[in-house]
Amino acid sequence: DQIALFEEKEKVLEIAEAGAVALEENDTSWIITSDRIRYVFGKKKGAFTELVRDGKALIEAPMTFETWRAPVDNDRNVRQVWEEAGYDRPWIRVYSCTAEITGEKAYLHCDFSIASVYRQPFLRAKALWEVNADGQIKLTLDADKDMTFPYMPRFGLQLVLPENQDQVEYIGYGPTESYQDKHRACWVDRFTTTVDELLEDYVKPQENGNHYHCTFVKVGELKAEGTKPISFNASYYTAQELTEKMHNYELEKSGHVIWHLDYGMSGVGSNSCGPELLKQYRLNEEKMHWELVIG
């Protein structure tokens, strides 16, 4: 066992002013530019749709807020409940999206909800995104969950990176996969690995390769850290691919690196043959506050 020598405190994360930024608006987007970056924020997406820094595209699809994980064997009894709630098909509805320049940073304010089509929202949120001239992004998010809905598989951001962004470094529980109720065989350290090596190759495809309680993550050229520890997963397979395929030999790589940065993920439990997931391991907070820096 490892012994913590001091109590872990919440970080204070700020992004510094780094030069002038400009802001443009069109019907669908806010566009932030500097000498180094061109970032596009989708007004109807509630997140960035393009990130270009030093002439290189950092993402290959819009960022999204994600609530689904490919069910593990122990999710077999709760999977239908999650699907009925619409966690497997989240849809973002943006109510307002405004932006301004203050000093040398751009600020975007977004009020949105998450629901599946034809269902009431299960999450209502307000997000503040800050961007500096070097391309660092700070997200400050406050979300309220409708407690009539079941606990959530996960809640966080998904980034779709170029396939060659496969080098991974993190400080957290490793080197094997870890979850909030499955990390006793792991230890906290700084690990370097690759996207291929993060894969836990289960015969029946499912959520795998997560790393819990991370204070720093780097995948390819992008780094991330939160004021509180986060979970992350980087894979060549989408959650949808892992959900739909019955055998590991049927899996098809997406052609991208799918990077999940999670505020939280429910534990994996033992409900395939044992009791339901214990309440302390469920992601079921009525109010969530998340601060995250990506850059």
Residue ranges and their predicted role:
Residues 1:
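Short, aromatic- and glycine-rich surface loops/edge beta-strands on solvent-exposed regions
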Residues 4-295:
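Beta-strand/loop-rich accessory regions of lumenal/periplasmic or secreted enzymes
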